[in-house]
């Protein structure tokens, strides 16, 4: 895995513009926050290695509010305030690590604080400001990510992370209409291997194709995330939520493995049998698999 390098420069606004001062990173002296950012860097390395993160593809947002001490809360903005595009009342005063727009996952894996930033949601719940380490503008999919974070807080969930990526096999399946109807894709993926049932027990939700970065796509995703931890955007990619970024990655990875098994079987010339409905129910019952989000 790539080494993780902490950014040491911060841009402090002064009269007349921005001046760069060499200062310590927000991660220094905050081991909890540093561990979260290092985990994000680790996951982005996996995304690149799997071929899910071409160029600057994919986005990550993680709630890091619990690690913000009084010094962090007093940090000034280092870039102009930006509008989110919607009002999200649960996010007032919350802090998030966000991947930067146009930034590559493979670069974030090595330099997380040069390819992402810590943002603070303003008191109007409709705008945000960057506080560290550098004025890296967040992902263009920020409205979707923050809408999901708002929902998670509203429902009292312990989930902190949202991940958008482009898993090859799952995106390929979204080009086939059969898999976009009802719960057909979930049924097929669950039937490929018992671990899919065990580690992605809420299946996968389907969102019809929508314009990337649009509020409409965010709203459609929010509806599906109420019942699923992983949502597939038709002909685009997945959005996953999890207790941390590794959890969101793992659920996506498990579903993609099942899709790969399905395609391997199809490449042998036959439609795979899959586990029977009875066999899948037995797995669910014996292992008492959850039908709702665990927290």
Where in the sequence are the language-model features?
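Residues marking helix boundaries in flexible regions
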Residues: 13-15, 23
């Amino acid at each position: 895995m790539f080494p993780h390098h902490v950014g040491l420069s911060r841009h402090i606004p002064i009269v007349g513009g921005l001046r760069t001062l060499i200062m310590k990173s927000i991660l220094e002296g905050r081991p909890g926050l540093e561990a979260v950012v290092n985990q994000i860097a680790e996951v982005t390395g996996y995304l690149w290695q799997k071929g899910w993160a071409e160029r600057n593809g994919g986005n990550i947002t993680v709630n890091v509010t619990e690690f913000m001490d009084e010094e962090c809360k007093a940090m000034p903005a280092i870039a102009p305030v930006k509008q989110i595009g919607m009002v999200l009342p649960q996010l007032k005063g919350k802090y998030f690590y966000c991947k930067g727009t146009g930034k590559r996952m493979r670069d974030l894996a090595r330099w997380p604080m040069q390819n992402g930033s810590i943002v603070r949601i303003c008191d109007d719940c409709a705008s945000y400001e960057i506080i560290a380490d550098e004025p890296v503008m967040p992902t263009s999919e920020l409205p979707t990510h923050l809408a999901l974070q708002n929902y998670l807080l509203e429902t009292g969930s312990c989930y902190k992370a949202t991940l958008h990526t482009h898993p090859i096999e799952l995106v390929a399946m979204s080009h086939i209409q059969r898999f976009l109807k009802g719960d057909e894709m979930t049924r097929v993926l669950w039937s490929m291997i018992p671990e899919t049932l065990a580690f992605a027990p809420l299946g996968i939700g389907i969102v019809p194709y929508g314009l990337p970065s649009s509020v409409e796509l965010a709203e459609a995703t929010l509806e599906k995330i109420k019942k699923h931890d992983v949502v597939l955007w038709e002909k685009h990619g997945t959005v996953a939520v999890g207790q941390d970024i590794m959890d969101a990655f793992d659920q996506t990875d498990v579903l993609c493995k099942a899709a790969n098994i399905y395609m391997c079987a199809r490449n042998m010339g036959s439609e795979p049998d899959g586990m029977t409905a009875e066999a899948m129910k037995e797995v669910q019952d014996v292992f008492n698999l959850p039908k709702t989000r665990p927290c």
